[in-house]
Regions:
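Conserved helicase ATPase core of P-loop NTP-dependent helicases/translocases
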Residues: 27, 40-52, 189, 199-200, ...
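Post-DEXD/H (motif II) to motif III coupling segment of the RecA-like Helicase ATP-binding lobe
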Residues: 75-76, 83-141, 307
């Protein structure tokens, strides 16, 4: 989507503002602009306020405080991860910017809270999706586990997830699955919203793994991701909040869902991390661990419905 957006911006021929919400995304755009267009972009954020270049990449946090200064400077505005537009910080920028062309980019047009209904108000009704030949259709492996997800509604949801995440047997299952797919030649991404689970699984996996959570600064994250790209490491344990969007590591080809997901847009975003084309890349695989219990079964059926809707092949194995 980065490449496509730059091609559109170049064709429109307008001074362009690209709005992002993380340093990782900003760096990604900087690199792609230089690689694709051969120019240096301007930066708004991290103490910089560079508005002279024909393309400027801005962090939303900084831009929201200075939008009145640049509201009439740009003919095109591109909002990356545009599903955030329902947040006032993002929508305020779009509302105040007088750009003729407003483009939103996202891996999904759905939000679990239903706020995707406002997307048309900001970006119109034209929707363009990449052709299937631009990515590799993954297969899904469902792993039947004997670990039980608590069903009692009297127990807070967070504690129910923790009961699974901190279960030593479950941790070993996750680490084992990651190692198995790495042994098959995959670069494996294991995602969870429980940092302790990720750290423990990384320890169990050993020297072939790294763990990226919000505790690491951007420089350290980049160094660890580079180890995956170069083949120094094969397994990446990453927090859901970081790898749910805005991360491009084309070498990744296997996704292990380490904690239950009941959010179709998030699931689609996570799968998007492993399906990008790369020469020599084998067919991506989504490893979905099915737990015991009524709640877990209901969520598992919902995920399976997503896979079927997307046309993914599904196979079931016992752990």
């Amino acid at each position: 989507k980065t490449f496509t957006a730059l091609a559109i911006a170049a064709k429109l021929g307008q001074k362009t503002l690209i709005v992002v919400h993380t340093l990782a995304l900003r760096k990604q755009w900087e690199e792609e602009i230089e690689k694709c267009l051969g120019i240096q972009c301007g930066i708004i954020g991290s103490g910089k306020f560079e508005t002279d270049p024909v393309i400027v990449v801005a962090n939303v946090q900084t831009l929201s405080k200075k939008i009145t200064q640049i509201s009439k400077m740009f003919g095109t505005i591109i909002l990356d991860e545009m599903h955030h537009v329902s947040a006032p910080t993002f929508s305020g920028i779009i509302d105040k910017c007088s750009a003729r062309y407003k483009i939103g980019l996202s891996g999904t047009l759905q939000r679990k809270d239903g706020k995707h209904i406002i997307f048309n108000d900001y970006f119109g009704f034209d929707v363009h999706q990449p052709k299937k030949e631009n990515y590799i259709v993954p297969r899904v492996t469902i792993v039947k586990s004997e670990v039980r997800f608590p069903d009692s509604s009297k127990i807070p949801w967070a504690k129910r997830v923790n009961a699974v995440a901190y279960d030593e047997g479950y941790q070993r299952i996750v680490a084992q699955l990651a190692s198995v797919y790495a042994a098959k030649g995959h670069k494996v991404l294991v995602v969870s919203d429980r940092v302790q689970l990720l750290k423990r699984c990384a320890e169990l996996t050993g020297d072939n793994a790294t763990c990226i959570t919000g505790e690491l600064d951007q420089t350290t994250r980049d160094k660890e991701i580079e180890k995956i790209r170069t083949g120094e490491l094969d397994i990446l344990y990453g927090s859901q909040s970081i790898f749910g969007e805005g991360i491009s590591v084309n070498e990744l080809s296997a996704l292990v869902l380490a904690t239950p997901i009941n959010n179709e847009p998030l699931l689609i975003q996570l799968i998007g991390r492993i399906i990008r084309k790369l020469e020599g890349k084998q067919q991506p695989v989504v490893v979905d661990i099915h737990l015991k219990g009524n709640t877990a079964s209901r969520q598992a059926r919902a995920r399976s419905a997503v896979y079927i809707k997307q046309g993914y092949d599904i196979q079931v194995v016992a752990n």
